[in-house]
């Protein structure tokens, strides 16, 4: 049984606010068990991935005085459970549009019984939701058709790069010019190699081009993007066993220091709590 509504992506009606709200971005939680972030502009409120439980997403939005009922859409990077497990709870009663590409939608259709209002986009083609333009682009990862996002707003851009094995030149160019970047820093190479609980085959997958970013690779990517409009970095998707917030932040900060760059704010997202909100 097909429980999906398929509609072409189109601009959504604006949500009226009495006072203009500057663009704000918060990572609600990020890690191996679940990932979700929240972006709010003057007219639009978006959830980017829904990998936390529906209850946790609701609780963490409530901390900011928001609720799922006010969302204008949910953007999905890919179909893996740590990015989608909250969809069922959020969409069971609320008709929140879910934006994803065809292969991601196809995969979700086989796994979910909940009826979803899917707004299918074509990978590589931008679209609008309210007052934002969403650019999406392919990233290397072991999913059906994983993407990153560059969300353009009146106040600047927000880039989302989670779950990718390599920050290619093409990927970096797609987020160049953002004001804030949420980027994966999954593992410390030494800790992963010394981990006795993971089979070598799993380690190879993690370190592969379609796996996850090491701290050192993340640091190089951030250095590459640092000369320009970039002001805020949020490191995410840290491994519970092969990384720590301190190690990840130090790796990026040291790389920037060596390059003589000291103008960036670096935050690290965790599974347990939202990050401090970034205002563009």
Where are the predicted features?
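Active-site neighborhood of phospho(di)ester-bond hydrolases with catalytic His/Asp-centered motifs
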Residues: 48-51, 71-79, 99-102, 159-162, ...
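Active-site metal-binding loops of divalent metal-dependent hydrolases
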Residues: 29-30, 50-52, 79, 139-142, ...
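C-terminal regulatory/interaction regions
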Residues: 2-9, 13-18, 246-280
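Metallo-beta-lactamase
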Residues: 101-156
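Active-site environment of divalent metal-dependent phosphoester hydrolases
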Residues: 33, 81-84, 105-107, 143-144, ...
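Cap/insert and terminal regions of metallo-dependent hydrolase folds
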Residues: 169-270
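Conserved beta-strand hairpin/beta-sheet module of binuclear metal-dependent hydrolase folds
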Residues: 4-6, 12-64, 147-163, 180
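Active-site metal-binding motif and surrounding structural segment of the metallo-beta-lactamase
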Residues: 54-100, 179
